[in-house]
């Protein structure tokens, strides 16, 4: 487990905190491996009834650490990001997101796979994939329109419209 992913269990609820505040909680491949392990364990555990995902300090997550991803992926099996996305999208138990600040890119994608999203007033939601020359991952181009409607999803995905917590509450 990387020191940037913190797990705490209390009264059958595990909280996973993305804890890399010096990089606005940008996620590395090692962090994805730790998050995949945690979700896979949760899916199999009878001791835990709910799983909360949150970010440390002022950010939920600023998305992928692009410098880390530019180094390439490991060659041993399924890449950690794919393991994580598979684990979050197929988890048979309740997933709760506690969004304490900006959720960017894959941070929004994560939310689309959660059963409940609780957002602080400081939360914002943005998907700068096109501006970065990337494609939305893990069915976010399907799930975002289903959640916020086609017009808002297109505005978010194609023009990087940022939703604040008050606006997101409408959806």
Indicate where each model-derived feature is located.
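Terminal peptide-recognition signature
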Residues: 16, 20, 35, 53, ...
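Conserved CoA-thioester-binding segment of acyl-CoA-metabolizing enzymes
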Residues: 1-56, 86
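Structured helix-beta-strand junction loops
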Residues: 10, 45, 56, 72, ...
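Glycine- (often His-adjacent) and acidic-residue-rich active-site loop
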Residues: 40, 47, 55-90, 103, ...
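Hydrophobic alpha-helical membrane-association signature
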Residues: 31-34, 80, 110
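Crotonase-fold acyl-CoA enzyme core
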Residues: 89-171
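Phosphate-coordinating loops and pocket residues in cytosolic domains that bind phosphorylated ligands
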Residues: 26-29, 62, 71, 131, ...
